[in-house]
């Protein structure tokens, strides 16, 4: 079924190597910082790969504007950063898995 003993052993070795690569990739993802923007860069939010907000930058020109608009821009920048993190994680994991597609809704790690 697996090409004899060597085949199964090789399969297990490959699985272990992939698991090790994934662990390293997860550490790298957690350390990375991604910046999302809104209002053509007037509001920027920097998040870690684990979705913790590290920094919020607001262009001084917005401080005179309407509070509700500023709140909307901050929320939009957070959402943009989060989307970029998800996209980056997907790309990094594709490197580890060799482009293996996961079923819809399933995220790595399992």
Swiss-Prot record:
Main location class: cytoplasm
GO terms of molecular function: DNA binding
SUPFAM superfamilies linked: YbaB-like
Bilayer-spanning residue ranges: none
GO CC terms, sorted: bacterial nucleoid; cytosol
Region (Disordered): 90-110
Pfam families, alphabetized: YbaB_DNA_bd (PF02575)
UniProt KW keywords: Cytoplasm, DNA-binding
Places the protein is found: Cytoplasm, Nucleoid
Subunit structure: Homodimer.
Function (record text): Binds to DNA and alters its conformation. May be involved in regulation of gene expression, nucleoid organization and DNA protection.
Record NCBIfam families: DNA_YbaB_EbfC
Family: Belongs to the YbaB/EbfC family.
Protein's recorded name: Nucleoid-associated protein Sden_2380
Originating organism: Shewanella denitrificans (strain OS217 / ATCC BAA-1090 / DSM 15013)
